[in-house]
From Swiss-Prot:
Enzyme Commission number(s): 3.2.1.21
Glycosylation positions in this chain: 291, 362, 372
Gene of this entry: BGLU6
Name of the protein in its database record: Beta-glucosidase 6
Domain of life according to the entry: Eukaryota
Result, substituting residue 427 to Q: Decreases activity toward gibberellin A4 beta-D-glucosyl ester 200-fold
């Protein structure tokens, strides 16, 4: 997953428990509450609650699922390096095996089909296609993803393919520091074109990047995820990096990389393949801590430093004016030619949404003095508590509070700010702990997860039917319990329980039956 989390596609990291303040802060985002709010719980959801053609699926990521890290010519990635660095992963695990989907994809596709899922969002490992990031194509990698795509289509499941879900080839990190160098734009575009050419006859929905905001913050500001660069707390945690500049450089290159890939697709492949390209943005929703003007403005500003940072250039041709004013010369500028290519380069908006926080104006200099980073630039503080009371019930991950109304508010924000773009919820879900003292039988009783999906989907349906938001699909994170980035195997997001002690056997949680009933009605 991707998120301040480590996830899913999330970015959840259990290590944030030791630095709860950093957790909240580094997942900045927010805006004033808009739109009507549906009840926290809703009943009677069916397929008919959503428009005709609305897509239901589950989501995954290559590094979290595949395993087989040294098979069939796959090259090393920055996450291989990070996971094998002592102290980086909460449970000291790695994803060398993960849930072994590389070998078990046919079994897992059958699980999706049995539930009645329409689509599967998975990522291609760049280092399986180009082991060194560039150069010679690895045919074994091409063959594997052809088999996966064909197997999905044979079961009537549409592939939604992510090109980059955090697993940069280590060779490019070694060669020129990866996303910090402008060369990455051309190398990513070349990799993307190879995927368009090889798989585009069957893949009609491409997600070029998963959670670029999470990568910029967790990888280059907080240093809690690969490649683990930062300068916060006087480099006590990271050996190298600059938290005040590198996140902005990396973000700029992400935006240019998507635009370059989109330009190639539209010029050479769109006419014959007729696919669409988007990005999966990680977006927390934030409500003002109070109804004061200063907190309302802080919430808006925080959201601009999250979604606006990465989405505004595609709709308006530049970063938010608030960022220009507060970041100054540290925020890169688009040339006129670059802005022309970037603006309009999104066919749809992917949203990875899990939780909602309160946001207030930061009226102290402590954060700026200690961190000197993007959080300090926002001038905000985001917390899941107000007056000592949590904003909602908490899942297992310390960052994940269950606030279904945030889904509807966020959809209205996207509709209003970006003039009703097509939206897919590319990730949404919650986790349980990997508790060794709970039996498998009890672990399958996930009523909390059922309520989570029911309530978030109820608010999503209301945003479509009552508010006119153009939302076209929903992907649950995740099909299986899996390796959750810096949280390792300590966090279970799956609809299916994976027995890590017994050959990775898959067992359906009660939420599987809930989705099956939803999708059949």
């Amino acid at each position: 997953m991707g998120r301040i989390k480590s996830s899913s596609g999330r970015c959840s990291t259990a290590r944030l428990e030791a630095v709860a303040v950093l957790v909240v802060v580094f997942g900045v985002a927010s805006s004033s509450l808009r739109g009507c709010i549906a009840q926290q719980s809703g009943g009677g959801l069916t397929r008919g609650s959503f428009p005709e053609g609305f897509v239901f699926g589950t989501a995954s990521a290559a590094y979290q699922y595949e395993g087989a890290v040294k098979e069939d010519g796959r090259g090393q990635t920055i996450w291989d390096t990070f996971a094998h660095t002592f102290g980086k992963i909460t449970d000291f695990s790695n994803a060398d095996v993960a849930v072994d989907q590389y070998h078990r994809f046919e079994e897992d596709i059958q699980l999706m089909a049995d539930m009645g899922m329409d689509a599967y969002r998975f990522s291609i490992a760049w280092s399986r296609i180009y082991p060194n990031g560039v150069g010679q194509v690895n045919q074994a990698g091409i063959d594997h993803y052809n088999k996966l795509i064909d197997a999905l289509l044979a079961k009537g499941i549409q592939p939604y393919v992510t090109l980059y879900h955090w697993d940069l080839p280590q060779a490019l990190e070694d060669k020129y520091k990866g996303w910090l160098d402008r060369q990455i734009v051309d190398d990513f575009a070349a990799y993307a074109e190879t995927c368009f050419r090889e798989f585009g006859d069957r893949v009609k929905h491409w997600i070029t990047l998963n959670e670029p905001h999470t990568v910029a913050i967790q990888g280059y500001d907080a240093g809690l995820q690969a490649p683990g660069r930062c300068s916060v707390l006087l480099h006590l945690y990271c050996k190298a990096g600059n938290s005040g500049t590198e996140p902005y450089v990396v973000a700029h290159h992400f935006i240019l990389a998507h635009a370059a890939a989109a330009s190639i697709y539209r010029t050479k492949y769109k006419a014959t393949q007729n696919g669409q390209l988007g990005i999966a943005f990680d977006v927390m929703w934030f409500e003002p801590m109070s109804n004061t003007t200063i907190d309302i403005e802080a919430a808006k500003r925080a959201q601009e430093f999250q979604l606006g940072w990465f989405a505004d250039p595609f709709f308006f041709g530049d970063y938010p004016a608030t960022m220009r004013a507060r970041v100054g010369e540290r925020l890169p500028r688009f040339t006129a030619d670059e802005a022309a290519v970037v603006k309009g380069a999104l066919d749809f908006v992917g949203i990875n949404h899990y939780t909602t926080y309160y946001t207030r104006h930061n009226n102290t200099n402590i954060i700026g003095t200690l961190l000197n980073n993007t959080l300090a630039d926002t001038g905000t503080v985001s917390l899941p508590f107000k007056n000592g009371k949590p904003i909602g019930d908490r899942a297992n991950s310390i960052w994940l509070y269950i606030v279904p109304r945030g889904m509807r508010s966020l959809m209205n924000y996207v509709k209003e700010r970006y003039n009703s773009p097509p939206v897919y919820i590319t990730e949404n879900g919650m986790d349980d702990s990997n508790n060794p003292f709970i039996s498998i039988k009890d672990a399958l009783k996930d009523s909390k997860r059922i309520k989570y999906h029911n309530d978030y989907l109820t608010n999503l349906a209301a945003s479509i039917k009552e508010d006119g938001c153009d939302v076209r699909g929903y992907f649950a994170w995740s099909l299986l319990d899996n390796w959750e980035w810096a949280a390792g195997y300590s966090s279970r997001f799956g609809l299916y329980f994976v027995d890590y002690k017994d050959n990775l056997k898959r067992y359906p949680k009660n939420s599987v039956q809930w989705f099956k009933a939803l999708l059949k009605t």
